[in-house]
Amino acid sequence: MKVYHSSDTAQVGTILINDYKKNIELVRPFVIALKQNKECFFNLCLSGQYMRAVLGKFNMKNMDTYSVKWATEGLFEYVRQNEFPGLPNRIESNYFFDSIESSKRLFEEDWGEADQEERDKIRLFEAELRDDNPALFDMNWFDEAFEVIYELESLDQIDTSIEYARNYFGGKQSENYRFEIVSNKEAVIVNDITEKLK
């Protein structure tokens, strides 16, 4: 199946490796915290808010939202493990789009405000995904959960984020849905089409 993938490290011929950065280690503590209880998860997120404030104060560019990203991924993984175990783990999968237009939209959302040097690092590829039945999810639910965790002030907000994760894995469409293809199967980069981002 032909799909589209953005990367700053891949090149034509690359076989994409699931979780090549080993980010699962950053997610696991949040999953463990939720297995204990919501209060434990809340406290871990609060520690992350403190680190975000420290990193922001010392101008450590692009570092201040990392703990929110991993907390959100941990919450989604907890929901997946407990309610949707047959679906792929987000962290141990690769992400794709079914069209160049969707890839361009994500590029603008993620790197639209970055300086040109950062934007130039991102390449757009056509890939051959060897998965007959990849998962298709509305990425807006993840973004909504991220925003809730970013502003986390109460345990009720954790329940809201859990509901967003259920919507994501349950295949529910948001009003302005944006689908991503998530697969833990082999994919090979076949063509660099970065010029189509412009």
What does each of the following model-derived ranges do?
Residues 5-10, 21-22, 64-88:
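Short aromatic-glycine-(Arg/Gly/Cys) micro-motifs in beta-strand/loop hairpins
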Residues 2, 8-62, 90-92, 101-114, ...:
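Conserved NAD+-utilizing ADP-ribose enzyme module
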